Amino acid sequence: MMEGRTNTRVFRNQSELDIVKLLVDEWRKRNGVLRSTFDLEINASLGSRSPQREFIMQHNESDAAFIRRLLQRRGIAWFFQSGLPRRGEQRRPEAIGHTLVLFDDPNQLARNAAGSVRFHRDAATEQRDSITGWSAVRMAQPGQASLHTWDYKQPRGREFMTTSTRSRGNQGKQGNELAAALDDYHVAAPHLGDTARDLVELGDVQMAHYEYAAKSFHGEGGVRDLAVGEWFRLTGHSEIDSHPDNEREFVVTSQHIVARNNLPVEIGTRVERLFSHNGWSADDYGVFANSDHSGEPIRYKTRFTCVRRGIRIVPPRPTVPRPALQTAIVVGPANDEVWCDELGRVKIRFPATRPEDHTHAGGAGSSDTDADSAWVRVASSWAGSALGTHGQCGARLLPPVGTEVLVEFAGGDPDRPIIIAQMFNGAAPPPAFRHEAGLPDTKYQSGIRSREVQGQRGNQLRLDDTPGQISAQLASDHAGTELNLGYLTEPRQGGSAAPRGEGAELRSEEAIALHAARGILLSAWKLLGGGRKGGQLARDDYLELLRECGELCAALGNHAAEHNGMPVDTREQDELLARFKKWEGGSNTMPDAAEPGEPVIGITSPAGIGFASTKAIVSYSARDIDTVAQQHLQLTAGQRFSLNAGKGISLFAHNGGLTGIAHAGKLLLQSQHDDTDINSAKNLKLTATEGTATIAAKVILLVAEDGSFLKLGDGPPVMGSKQPLKFHAPDFLYDEPESMTAQFPTFGQAGADQKLVVRYAPGIPLENGERPAGGVVKDAKLKIALSDGSAMQARSGIDGKSDLIERGAMHMAEIGLMRGGDQ
């Protein structure tokens, strides 16, 4: 009956015996005939030894084939026994029906009603049935059975993945030598055993089967009480009688019976004719003689096989159904769009499973929840071999809940599903990329598109291979952030898109930052060089421009210094050029060179660089800023132009003159604490077109080249000359004494007093473990050396500021920090 029902269903967290019990109970409950004529009896020796399995699947198997597979895997033997068990009491052989008996210990089997059976001729005159034929049968079997099963949870524990069992049976001297060369090495499905001990037991099962099959006995006779699954004692056989008592007891393992009814001849003939018409041929039983030696017809004859009692009876290794590829749906708890464990495994439901087959487990197996399967591995196109998560490499593309997946079965075992692919379907078609049309309009596009959990946004890698318009895009819907490469277009609709540029584009509706510990080179120079791409930091043109910059700066600066201008300092510029030259030190292009200590940023272009902003542009250097132009340096301000220096300003024009004009407003030139010299190689002209030219000083002295002079102030006015004085005027007017008050500007005495602020570098932890960005350093001792040769000590307060350093002019300072006596 069980052969007639084929099913596909899932069992969770049950042992093989639990499942067999469940199936038999289902048959008995659903079928009134079987309920009264069929039952299951499990030998007490089995107990609860079988571990629970997370996942066992019946796949397109009959219930009978499925039960056989489960029992064979655990090495559990079975037979059918006439009669039904009486719950809590002995079996009722008189009851109409059969019992499926499961056992693994032959010593627990019942003794046959025949008890001791003689080896003797079987004649009608004999008072007891006897065995008339007896022979021992030996079959060469492997001397070792090995079992290997991959354990992906402990991949480095190879020694626990293989178990080997040597035969304890005796196959004779030559038989043992032959068996020693035979090793049944079987590679099973992964993770076959629940534990290492369980794997050893499964390996022992196969060896026990070979020991069982190595030696058996064939017999025949007329013993009507013989039955499979029961043992008897054989007597009267000379060879058997020579063995110890325990080796004269045998368990019947199979039986073939021919029985004839004692009907009258004319009725018997009609019965034979009826059997013939129904295809029931007696030829199958021709191996049995129709009469004994006296010529009398034999009414009953049996041919049987048996093994010595005590030999473990074990069925052969199961043949798994090896299902083809199957479709499944990824499942998970409610409100979880992605559900996995630390190994990236997911839960699945096979759509073919029926709810009515899983009511015993509360629907687990067909509930569309994470109870429908054990964790199932997901195959990846790339999986690394590193220990631990953070050092690992590989591709991680977990199927979300609801995804259709393609399932293969490791080792062909339905109990070992593996997801090998994810599938689109009518309800879940292939994704369209951001703002782009779907298939088939964008059939030239390929890539990856993710989806925000509990949202509609996503991230994507899009490769567009449209003829003549290839491009790549790495993008996130958050802030519209995109990196576009190649032939840039608007989103494709209907297979076409408007062009919007070529090259590369990084864009975002939020911030963009570039961080590089060695430096950044922004260059618009075209790289040349045949099939070579050119160096990453190719900068020959840039270095040439920097060299020209330094030469011009030094040449004009030195010339200015020779003509009373302030000298220029090009050391910082020269050091920067040197760092740019050594930029690649320690890299793969210059592995033997020393690595530069400080990162730099270079910006260069052959046709110009433009900076523009609707608000402020701030440029600052803790050292020098050198701005050099080979031709014109033009600074323009729509309103004020302020130029401030802490230690001198020098303006030098080698040619073309120096022009300073205040078109509207006052022109103010002051030397507040020192002299003012205005020199001209030719003429000096001071004019006041509409006002008064006023020269005010404590003493005014006008001196001509020939020695003539006019001195005003510090006493009476004095004129002097080696030449006669000459006056041109119509008259001389003399009046009372009179003077004017000179108006002098007031110059303040403010110095360059400063307080130093000491801060931690970003990332340096404080005493409490915090890592603030630029947190102040409290109570630090400072040794300060100034460029005027003076030195002092100071201490930072709770705000990180030092004591006030008072100086009349600005100076460069070298600072040493000490804390706790350490510098």
Language-model-detected regions and their locations in the chain:
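Amphipathic alpha-helical and helix-coil boundary elements used as assembly
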Residues: 1-823
